[in-house]
Curated annotation (Swiss-Prot):
One example GO MF annotation: GTP binding
Protein name, per record: Elongation factor 1-alpha
Family membership noted in the UniProt record: Belongs to the TRAFAC class translation factor GTPase superfamily. Classic translation factor GTPase family. EF-Tu/EF-1A subfamily.
Residue ranges, annotated region (G2): 68-72
Location of the protein in the cell: Cytoplasm
Keywords: Cytoplasm, Elongation factor, GTP-binding, Hydrolase, Magnesium, Metal-binding, Nucleotide-binding, Protein biosynthesis
Catalysis: reaction(s): GTP + H2O = GDP + phosphate + H(+)
Task of the protein: GTP hydrolase that promotes the GTP-dependent binding of aminoacyl-tRNA to the A-site of ribosomes during protein biosynthesis.
Boundaries of every tr-type G domain copy: 5-217
Top EC category: hydrolase
Region annotation (G4) ranges: 144-147
InterPro entries (UniProt xref): EFTu-like_2, G_TR_CS, GTP-eEF1A_C, P-loop_NTPase, Small_GTP-bd, T_Tr_GTP-bd_dom, TRAFAC_GTPase_members, Transl_B-barrel_sf
Annotated gene: tuf
Enzyme Commission number(s): 3.6.5.3
């Protein structure tokens, strides 16, 4: 039986109006994956007999977006010869960042779209920095709107140099830079004859070569809990996605911060594991599972708890502890000062946190300190801060278990900042 092709999740990033949606639209259009609802609309409007034009599809997609309906993300899947690709999101969604951090959909790669006309713009930098903060390892650069610069090689090389400088500064290496015109369909799926000077991959060929995501099986077991069910005749069944490590039937797991909150170990033996209603002996990273735990009641645990082995339990940050984090402020109406208390979203947990100290302001591009102990930080700033949770929460330093070290800061219905945990300081 042929081994299944690897599944790869990608996000599209880049400055507003540089052509992210058009590029996604072109990929779907040229691979025959236009969302159902668009095709339906086409038929309803009696457009039969007319050809199903790309421009028409893009207008419909744009209308849907303006009405606040983003095309159902589940539809944005397509295949390349060696990969199943899911486009999990594109910025512009209000919850883009939160989804990328807390969603079940950690991106494996990002496509950075840069217009040949403008070159690197402020949001290009912000999104690239964000990709790094969110731990996206692979980047593909699409230099779009080549039709607007007459497919000029010199202009392509100029913009390519700008992007390379930015990404190398952020620590990215070995990324393809592809000249495309999403609107004209050049070098997206079909190889372009307008740019004979370019002999690298098309966008879809580059997507086909994204390295297969590694499964972090050697890290300690961590399963953030999404829900807890009580099933007659079975018992308590927590449900969650294995982020790291592996879980076998018969092992003993402990739940945190539940154990810390109740001042007693909330733990038990795993009697069974199920995935998609099939029994499993062993669960691996990426598996969405339900598992039955002996001696743990439904009221002991809840969404936001994390299961781990008793030999290496999840790390709890208590209310007397603090943690040091690197954040990037994405969207704050005024400025963040010490004492600010928004909500932290990490894995499946949500807890209020307080900004205890602003240690340093960083240059978002280089990560170098530009100001020690700033009075405030505002939109666009990167900073090192000390945060204190107002309720116990499981967090891990990003160097140790990155899946549990990234977080979003939310307030007033929007994502204020994204960040990663550098270290945890124990209070007495």
């Amino acid at each position: 039986m042929p081994k299944d092709k690897p599944h790869v999740n990608i996000v599209f990033i880049g400055h507003v109006d540089h052509g992210k949606s058009t590029t996604i639209g072109r990929l779907l259009y040229d691979t025959g994956n236009i969302p159902e609802q668009i095709i339906k609309k086409f038929e309803e409007m009696g457009e039969k007999g007319k050809s199903f034009k790309f421009a028409w599809v893009m207008d419909r997609l744009k209308e849907e977006r303006e009405r606040g309906i983003t095309i159902d993300v589940a539809h944005t899947k397509f295949e390349t010869p060696h990969r199943y690709i899911t486009i999990i999101d594109a910025p512009g969604h209000r919850d883009f960042v939160k989804n990328m951090i807390t969603g079940a959909s950690q991106a494996d790669a990002a496509v950075l779209v840069v217009a040949a006309t403008d070159g690197v713009m402020p949001q290009t930098k912000e999104h690239a920095f964000l990709a790094r903060t969110l731990g996206i390892k692979h980047i593909i650069v699409a230099i779009n709107k080549m039709d607007m610069v007459n497919y000029n090689q010199k202009r392509f090389e100029e913009v390519k140099a700008q992007v390379e400088k930015l990404l190398k500064m952020l620590g990215y290496k070995d990324f393809p830079v592809i000249p495309i015109s999403a609107w004209e369909g050049e070098n997206v799926v079909k190889k372009s004859d307008k740019m004979p000077w370019y002999n690298g991959p098309t966008l879809i060929e580059a997507l086909d070569q994204i390295p297969e995501p590694e499964k972090p099986v050697d890290k300690p077991l961590r399963i953030p809990i999404q829900d807890v069910y009580s099933i007659k005749g079975v018992g308590t069944v927590p449900v969650g996605r294995v982020e790291t490590g592996k879980l076998r039937v018969g092992e003993v797991v402990i739940f945190e911060p539940a154990s810390t909150i109740f001042h007693k170990p909330i733990q038990g033996e795993v009697k069974s594991i199920e995935m998609h209603h099939e029994p499993l002996e062993e669960a691996l990273p990426g598996d969405n599972i339900g598992f039955n735990v002996r001696g743990v009641s439904k009221n002991d645990i809840k969404r936001g708890d994390v299961a781990g082995h008793t030999t290496n339990p999840p790390t709890v940050v208590r209310t007397k502890d603090t943690f040091k984090a690197q954040i990037i402020v994405l969207n704050h109406p005024t400025a963040i000062t010490v004492g600010y208390s928004p909500v932290l979203h990490a894995h499946t947990a949500q807890v209020p946190v307080r900004f205890e100290q602003l240690l340093a302001k960083l240059d978002p591009k280089t990560g170098n300190i530009v100001e020690e102990n700033p009075q405030f930080i505002k939109t666009g700033d990167a900073a090192i801060v000390i945060l204190r949770p107002m309720k116990p929460v499981v967090l891990e330093p990003v160097k140790e278990i990155p899946q549990l070290g990234r977080f979003a800061i939310r307030d007033m219905g929007m994502t204020i900042a994204a960040g990663m945990v550098i270290s945890i300081q124990r209070g007495e």
